[in-house]
Amino acid sequence: MKENLIHYRTCVCNINYHMVWSVKYRRKILSAEVEAYLQELVQEIAEDKGFTVHLFECGEGDHVHCFVSAPPKLSITAIVKYLKGISGRKLFERFPEIRNQLWKGELWNHSYYVEMVGAVSEEDIRRYIEHQSKAY
C-alpha cells in the first residue's frame, strides 16, 4: 500500500476510483476505432486536469470502465464531468456519424457508477478505529 501513496504539500493520499458510464440508449457505437481515439482522449484529459488513468476499457461497444487515481482537491463529480463532457464533444467532432445514432446531441447517459478502490477494507478501518481508545 505504501508504494501507492501520493505525496502533496499538505497531505499524503491514495484515492482510487472505478468508474463506469454508458452510451445514451446503450447504443453500441464504441467501435475499435472510436475506442482507440477515446482512450487517447481520456489520457489527455487526465493529464490536463491533474489525475491519472491507470486502466481504460470499453465494454460491449456501449459502456466504459475507467480506473483512476486523483488528488483530494478533485471531486469524483468533477472527474466524471471532465471525462464525459470533453470526450463526448470531441468524439462528435471526430466521428460526426455517431450523432445520427443518438438523439438530442448527447453521447453519454447522464448517470454513472463509481466505487472507491483501496488496499484497506472497511472492516480493517473499523477495527483500527475501535482499538484507538484502548491504546491509552
Protein language model regions, located:
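Basic nucleic-acid-binding interfaces
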Residues: 1-136
